[in-house]
């Protein structure tokens, strides 16, 4: 039987700011606390991490920083959810290139999508990276 990709607890972390900029020392402190507590996965750039207010550059930096800092000691789940499928695909590709272990997408908000539209949204994001085959 194939081993599960994730086990144990995961934490969705906040994105600390100081003077309008990401506070990377504080971010590392948050990551260190989670690792010391035995957390098995960390969600970066989810709603708790202020994903909707981050620039694309900030999002890419946070995910890359988390992957590098955690260095395989836990899984990194990268938030790629937006109201725009094409933008979520771009974020998914960036996250995969940075080494994120999984993606977190959201249902498009403010638009009432059909069930077929929702399926297309999620499948498009899921199939956007070369790692898509790993989940099958």
Model segments located where?
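N-terminal glycine-rich anion-binding loops that anchor highly charged ligand groups
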Residues: 4-8, 29-43
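Active-site mouth loops of central-metabolism enzymes
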Residues: 9-26, 54, 76-86, 110-115
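Catalytic cores of alpha/beta
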Residues: 84-95
């Amino acid at each position: 039987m194939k081993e599960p990709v994730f086990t144990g607890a995961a934490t969705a972390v906040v994105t600390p700011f100081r003077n309008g900029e990401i506070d990377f020392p504080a971010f590392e402190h948050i990551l260190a606390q989670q690792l010391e507590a035995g957390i098995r996965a960390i969600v970066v750039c989810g709603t708790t991490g202020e994903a909707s207010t981050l620039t694309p550059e900030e999002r890419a930096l946070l995910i890359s920083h988390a992957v590098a800092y955690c260095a395989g000691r836990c899984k990194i789940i990268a938030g790629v959810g937006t109201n725009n499928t094409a933008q979520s695909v771009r974020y998914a590709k960036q996250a995969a290139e940075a080494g994120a272990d999984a993606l977190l997408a959201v249902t498009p908000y403010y638009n009432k999508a059909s069930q077929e539209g929702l399926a297309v949204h999620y499948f498009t994001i899921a199939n956007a990276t070369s790692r898509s085959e790993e989940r099958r």
